[in-house]
């Protein structure tokens, strides 16, 4: 049974005339009759009574007509839905990003994407790179903005480096600036009260590793927060924190950012997706927008 045969059948049923039905569907009358006969043979029943030139539906034809209309309507709906997705008028993208990227980079990128494709729904998951890599691996995300290098046990992922960002030390504007000469050495953090991110957070691991490389264990006054919480605790004067420059630049006048002395700390942000699964069309378009300036 073919969609074309059902289309011809519905046309004849509505016109009650083979020639007029053939004109309606833009096919020759013999071809239409041949397809109707093939459909009847496949179903094992006559669909039309052709007595004395009058075309009427048989019981089998009456039973098939509403089903055929529904099948054709569903096919048309499916065709429209697929075309909408293919032309990026509808769809969704599941994007993961670290909190600092959500704060610093994504607002402008997502605004640009939304302006281009307002019908595409953006589902954002915020988390550390370890969590995002795990979500990519199980198919819960289409794309993720992660920090390189990836965890050693990461599944096969394709990554494209997006940017490198410097880390800075943020402190309350009400307390003395840390360090000397307008810059902070990692060694200057020894004994300083640090507001620290939760375990599994890339910035925590990077900061702790840098302190240990200088021969000391960092001292935490508060630990376990996400980006917004950490900045809030710093504003309240509970300590200082090491954060990306793009976050500090947007944190307001009540926070003061001090650069780290050379060589400083930097991290690389990359856009990742699974290597074994091609991202959906909408995700590929977001990928193009994200990587546009690269």
Regions found by a protein language model. Give the residues of each.
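Conserved amphipathic alpha-helical core elements
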Residues: 39-40, 113
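Hydrophobic hinge/microswitch elements
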Residues: 128-141, 147, 198-258
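A short LG(V/I)-centered, amphipathic sequence patch enriched
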Residues: 40-57, 62
